[in-house]
C-alpha cells in the first residue's frame, strides 16, 4: 500500500499532486494546506478527475497537520513562492522558519517516511528540514534543470528528446552546472559540431526559469510533471537515474547538492565517481559555495528568530 502526503497545495503542489494521483498507483493521498477550504475544494476537483479516469484513490484533505499520519512519502511544497526578480536564496529566512515548524511536527506521525523537498530554495530547505528533523530528506534538486537541458538540445538539433541524455548537478537554480561528461546525443558524446554550443545550452538552462516566471508568474507544468516522476520512482522502486540532492556530510553540516543518483525505494548509489575530473571539480566548487552561503543564511535565521 502506497500512502503519499502533500504538504502545501498551491500552484506547484496542486500540479504535482494531480500528476501523481492521475498515475493511479497511489492507494491513499493526504492533502494539507494552511489556507482554509483549499484542501477540501482541491479534493473535490481531484475526485471529479478520478471519476473521469475511473481510478480509485483514497483522498484525505485537511487544514490540521495532525491528520497527516502514516505516510510512506511526504512531499513538501509549503512556503512563500518565488516572485519575479527574486532569487531562491532571498526566500531562505521566511521559508526556513516554516521548515523548522514542519520538522518539529511531521516526524511525530510519519517517522521513517521519505521526505521530498520542493519548497525553494529547495536544496537549502532540504538541509534545514534534515537538520531539525533528523529524518531522511531528498531535494528535487537539478532534475528539472536536467530535463530543460535535454529538451533544449533536442529542440535545437530537431531530434526526439529521448535521443538526448545527460545531467545537471550542483545547487538547484542559477548556480547549477551542466555535467558535460554525461551529455550524449544519439549515444555519442556531445560535440559543438552538432550545431549548438555549450555556452548557449548553459545560458538557456540558467535563464529560462526567470523568463517563464516573468511572463507566467511561476514555473508549474514542467516541474510538476518532473517531480511527479520522482515520486513515482520512489514509490514503485523504479531505480531510475535522476539528478536529485541527497544528504551528505560537508564539514560540520549535512547539505544537499545534486548528483546523478539511482532513485528507487532506497536512494543511491550516486554516479559521482563516473564523472570526469572537470565535472567533479565543478561539483566540489558548487558544494563549497553552497556550504558557505548556507552557513551565512543560518546565522541570519538565528538572528531573525532571536529578534521575534
Swiss-Prot record:
Superkingdom of the source species: Archaea
Function of the molecule: Catalyzes the reversible oxidation of malate to oxaloacetate.
Lineage: Archaea, Thermoproteota, Thermoprotei, Sulfolobales, Sulfolobaceae
Record organism: Sulfurisphaera tokodaii (strain DSM 16993 / JCM 10545 / NBRC 100140 / 7)
Active site: 172 (proton acceptor)
EC number: 1.1.1.37
Name of the protein in its database record: Malate dehydrogenase
Family, per entry: Belongs to the LDH/MDH superfamily.
Keyword ATP-binding: no
Binding locations of NAD(+): 8-13, 33, 95, 118-120
GO BP annotations, alphabetical order: lactate metabolic process; tricarboxylic acid cycle
Gene3D superfamilies: Lactate dehydrogenase/glycoside hydrolase, family 4, C-terminal, NAD(P)-binding Rossmann-like Domain
Keywords, in A-Z order: NAD, Oxidoreductase, Tricarboxylic acid cycle
Amino acid at each position: 500500500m502506497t500512502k503519499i502526503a502533500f504538504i502545501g497545495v498551491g500552484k506547484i503542489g496542486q500540479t504535482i499532486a494531480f500528476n501523481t494521483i492521475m498515475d493511479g498507483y497511489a492507494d491513499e493521498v493526504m492533502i494539507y494546506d494552511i489556507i482554509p477550504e483549499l484542501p477540501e475544494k482541491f479534493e473535490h476537483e481531484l475526485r471529479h478527475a478520478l471519476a473521469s479516469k475511473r481510478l480509485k484513490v483514497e483522498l484525505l484533505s485537511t487544514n490540521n497537520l495532525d491528520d497527516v499520519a502514516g505516510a510512506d512519502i511526504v512531499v513538501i511544497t509549503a512556503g512563500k513562492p518565488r516572485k519575479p526578480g527574486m532569487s531562491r536564496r532571498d526566500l531562505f529566512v521566511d521559508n526556513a522558519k516554516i521548515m523548522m515548524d514542519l520538522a518539529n511536527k511531521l516526524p511525530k506521525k510519519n517517522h521513517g517516511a521519505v521526505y521530498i523537498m520542493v519548497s525553494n530554495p529547495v536544496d537549502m530547505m532540504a538541509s534545514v528540514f534534515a537538520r531539525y528533523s533528523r529524518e531522511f530528506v531528498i531535494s528535487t534538486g537539478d532534475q528539472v534543470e536536467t530535463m530543460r537541458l535535454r529538451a533544449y538540445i533536442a529542440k535545437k538539433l530537431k531530434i526526439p528528446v529521448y535521443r538526448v541524455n545527460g545531467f545537471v548537478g550542483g545547487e538547484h537554480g542559477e548556480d547549477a552546472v551542466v555535467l558535460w561528461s554525461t551529455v550524449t546525443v544519439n549515444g555519442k558524446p556531445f560535440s559543438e559540431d552538432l550545431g549548438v554550443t555549450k555556452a548557449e545550452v548553459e545560458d538557456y538552462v540558467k535563464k529560462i526559469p526567470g523568463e517563464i516566471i516573468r511572463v507566467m508568474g511561476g514555473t508549474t507544468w514542467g516541474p510538476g510533471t518532473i517531480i511527479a516522476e520522482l515520486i513515482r520512482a520512489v514509490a514503485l522502486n523504479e531505480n531510475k537515474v535522476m539528478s536529485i540532492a541527497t544528504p551528505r556530510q560537508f564539514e560540520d553540516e549535512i547539505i544537499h547538492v545534486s548528483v546523478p543518483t539511482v532513485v528507487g525505494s532506497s536512494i543511491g548509489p550516486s554516479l559521482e565517481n563516473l564523472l570526469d575530473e572537470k565535472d567533479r571539480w565543478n561539483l566540489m566548487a558548487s558544494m563549497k559555495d553552497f556550504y558557505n552561503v548556507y552557513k551565512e543564511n543560518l546565522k541570519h535565521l538565528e538572528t531573525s528568530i532571536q529578534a521575534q
